[in-house]
């Protein structure tokens, strides 16, 4: 009983010493939580909806270009806006905290890559990220292409490998990615890397389209089976 009383007294002492601090911290948590809910409901969600509305027609035009070709006029509209369409550069800048703003960076990077502006392609694509592995794989592959065009072979090779590894459970996508990385390694003198990746395609993805021809590429590098 005495021990219980001591615990109670210590609890009272704690409250007496720290009551103002506890109240302040508790109030701060409540206030921050309330502010976050208010921000989410009254600012962030409407902002996301607005960004989606602005990006929707741009995504339609981008999809059409991906199928028919990246004409100069269409790319300019996608990037900078026109004909009642907001450009992805403005959407990415104004709505950077939204999913649509993130997708706008991907589109901008792809457009820059297709028009030969490789430095800006790198800038936009490095700012893009998604949990959708197929899309992230494509972004990494484009980064590899941009770095290759800038003669930055080490970064190009790194992103080609990342393009494959981020989606390595998908046999088609991963085998294509690793094969591309292997070819790039072969053409840039990274012989040991090329051998390792060609063998990975053959051994890890035996049913892929490239697996049956891998021994031919290995033979070119002096590896005979």
Regions found by a protein language model. Name each.
Residues 1-28:
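N-terminal positive-inside, membrane-proximal cytosolic segments immediately preceding the first
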Residues 45, 92-101, 129-137, 165-173, ...:
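Short solvent-exposed coil/turn linkers within tandem alpha-helical repeat scaffolds
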Residues 89-145:
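Structured, soluble extracytoplasmic/luminal domains of envelope-associated proteins
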């Amino acid at each position: 009983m005495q021990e219980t009383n001591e615990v109670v007294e210590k609890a009272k002492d704690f409250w007496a010493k720290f009551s103002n601090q506890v109240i302040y911290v508790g109030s701060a948590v409540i206030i921050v939580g309330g502010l976050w809910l208010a921000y989410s409901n009254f600012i962030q969600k409407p902002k996301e909806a607005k960004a989606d509305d602005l990006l929707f027609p741009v995504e339609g035009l981008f999809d059409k270009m991906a199928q028919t070709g990246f004409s100069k006029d269409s790319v300019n509209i996608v990037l900078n806006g026109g004909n009642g369409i907001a450009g992805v550069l403005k959407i990415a800048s104004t709505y950077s905290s939204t999913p649509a703003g993130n997708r706008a960076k991907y589109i901008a990077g792809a457009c820059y890559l297709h028009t030969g502006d490789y430095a800006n392609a790198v800038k936009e694509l490095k700012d893009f990220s998604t949990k959708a592995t197929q899309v992230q794989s494509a972004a990494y592959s484009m980064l590899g292409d941009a770095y290759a065009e800038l003669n930055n072979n080490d970064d190009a090779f790194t992103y080609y490998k990342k393009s494959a590894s981020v989606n390595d459970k998908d046999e088609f996508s991963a085998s294509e990615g690793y094969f591309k990385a292997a070819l790039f390694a072969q053409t840039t003198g990274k012989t040991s890397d090329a051998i390792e990746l060609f063998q990975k395609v053959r051994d890890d993805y035996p049913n892929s389209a490239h697996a049956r021809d891998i021994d031919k590429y290995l033979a070119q590098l002096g590896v005979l089976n």
